[in-house]
Each structure stands twice: as C-alpha cells, then as structure tokens.
C-alpha cells in the first residue's frame, strides 16, 4: 500500500515557474532538515512498513471505489465515488497527517503544530499526535472555530491545544501565518505539519506523495471493476491536497481527463478588499503566498485578498504550486461552482445515495451537472468524495433557515 515514494522535480522545489522557497532565512535550516529527513526515510523499508500499518489498521485503508447507481442513473453515465469520507476522522486528511507525524517521529521531533480550516486537518493531526505521543497545537481561524465548533472540540478531546487566530480574515490563511511564527520560535523540537500541497518546498512534494495513496488505489480499483482507467476524474480544490493525491498517479495517462473544481463562492468577482470566491486557478494571478510562487487572489497592488466560500476547507486565497502548473499547462482542467450549487449537490447525494458529503466534496459533485451538459464526463467517471458532511450540517441548516 505505502509503495516506495518517488518524487521528481524539474528543478529543486519548482513546478515550471511555480513553487520554490520564499521564506525568511531563519526557516531555511528547518526546511533543509525536513527535506533531508524525507529523502532519507521515504523509501526506507522500516518506515514504509510502519506507514502501511497505520494506513491500514488506524486509518482504515484501502477505501472503497463505490458505484453510485442512483447518481449514475440521473446523469446517464457510470459514476464511482472514491470513499475518502470513510477514512478514520471522516476525510482524506489523515493520509498526510499520519505520514508526516511518523516522519517527525523518525526525525526525533516531540511537538507537532498545524493549521486547519474546516477542522479536518486539525482533527487528523490531533489523531496522529495522540497516537504517536506528540504534544500537539493547532492554529485555527476564529471564524472557522465558530463554524466548526464540533471539530475544535474533537481536537481538544484528543489532547490538542486549539489556538483561535483573531487576525486578518480569521480563516485558514491567517492560521497558516500564525503556525509559521510558532515554527520559527520552536524549530528545534517542533515539526510543522502542513495540511495541503502549499507552502515552501519540500511541503507540496511531501503532502502530494502521502496523499497519492488515493490515486494509486483508484487506479487498481478501476482496473478491477471496469477493466480500464476512468474517462474523467473530478476532485475539489482549495489548497489542492485531495486533488493532487487523486490526480498524481494519472498525470502520464493522457486519456484520463482531470478536473479540479474550485469554490466559486457568491460570484467570481472581487470587491476592493476581498474576493467573493476562492477560485485561485480560475481567477487568480501569479504571486507569492506562504513561501511559494503560485496562483493567488490579489489586488492590483499585489496584496492578498480575503477569500470566501461556504466551505471552510476551500476558503483559501491560493492553491498548491504543482496544481497551478498542471492547470496552466492544460493537463488539469480548472472549473468552479458557486456556494448554492455546492449546497444543492450536498442535498442531492444525501437523498440519492444515503451518503452525506462534506461541503468541500460537494463542489466536485456539483460539477457533474455542468460536465454532463458540456460532454466532459465520458462513460466512466470517478469523483473523489474527500470527506463526510456531518461537520457541515449546522452550516447547511443555517442556510436553509436563512440565518
């Protein structure tokens, strides 16, 4: 399961013109230490055997590739769901969290810090930290703590200290900023467990590699169930970890269409100080955010705009540099759906299949309707169901009540 991990970059830390290490000099030793540790252990048989054990017996892998018969009937094609919602904790986030936590253990670290938006990555970090015996601190935007109170409590229940961030937009972007500040102060004993394919090298590579278990499983399961690879694979994209994890094993399979669906929020436009969406691939510009050159939402002066989405996990002003490069090259197609369309898809899957999806995953599901109309689906489609939706029930209920 945890096959030997091979990571290739054209230039160290670069994906075409994106990526790199745009960080203060004080962080360079920590990034170099992390890269050296990862290169040392990523193909180590003992490390891989232990990672395989945790993925199988703790996380519950492999996850099913489920034929959604009622959804398939509605859209006139075979639609399979990759059930990452069934991973321990309710989302794909544990794939990366357990991988990085185990790496930190092998590197001799005793403390984990992380950022979180929807709370899924924070929860996954809390789970991994508790299981592997780490002191764990999670930074979470105060706005996100309010809309994801249950996840904040779950983290605290597992011994994690949750620190609300009350600066800026009080969301994921600001939580990442605070986590970096913590890391600078505590580099000696602390590993910063970034939750998406963002940040300075080597993070986008490491997170992608640990999440690629999704795509590797899809590849094997597709051959078992249909005898061939899918025509189309759809995944939501905020920072992009579930999308990259699903897409990466298929990059060289040019007949497989890869579609990343972003959060279109209220509308694909911006005010003077904020975007009304979180669609960096569709509407962003080249810039630097959290240590990497990528596509970001920014104003005419290059200042980062606050993003907006009904989904806390997609509410981010940038995107992973490798995903930005793949979208720019045309290998990945970037699309977006609005808040309303995502909520409609949330309700639709719940009614048709008895599966309540996360609002993040609902963005990928919502694009099925548009893709069917545009002829992008083909005869065999896989949608990555990146998480379950119990965390979002209060949000959807509030929208229904008009609160």
Curated annotation (Swiss-Prot):
Biochemical pathway: Amino-acid biosynthesis; L-tryptophan biosynthesis; L-tryptophan from chorismate: step 5/5
UniProt modified residues of type N6-(pyridoxal phosphate)lysine: 93
One CC-aspect GO term: cytoplasm
InterPro entries assigned to the protein according to its UniProt record, in alphabetical order: Trp_synth_b_CS, Trp_synth_beta, Trp_synth_beta/beta-like, TrpB-like_PALP, TrpB-like_PALP_sf
PROSITE patterns the UniProt entry points to: TRP_SYNTHASE_BETA
EC class of the enzyme, as a word: lyase
Cofactor(s), names only, from the UniProt record: pyridoxal 5'-phosphate
Short name of any one Pfam family annotated for the protein: PALP
GO molecular function list: tryptophan synthase activity
Enzyme nomenclature, EC number: 4.2.1.20
Intrachain disulfide bonds: none
Catalytic activity: (1S,2R)-1-C-(indol-3-yl)glycerol 3-phosphate + L-serine = D-glyceraldehyde 3-phosphate + L-tryptophan + H2O
Keywords: Amino-acid biosynthesis, Aromatic amino acid biosynthesis, Lyase, Pyridoxal phosphate, Tryptophan biosynthesis
The keyword Oxidoreductase belongs to this UniProt entry's keyword annotation: no
Described function: The beta subunit is responsible for the synthesis of L-tryptophan from indole and L-serine.
Assembly mode: Tetramer of two alpha and two beta chains.
Family from the record: Belongs to the TrpB family.
The protein, known as: Tryptophan synthase beta chain 1
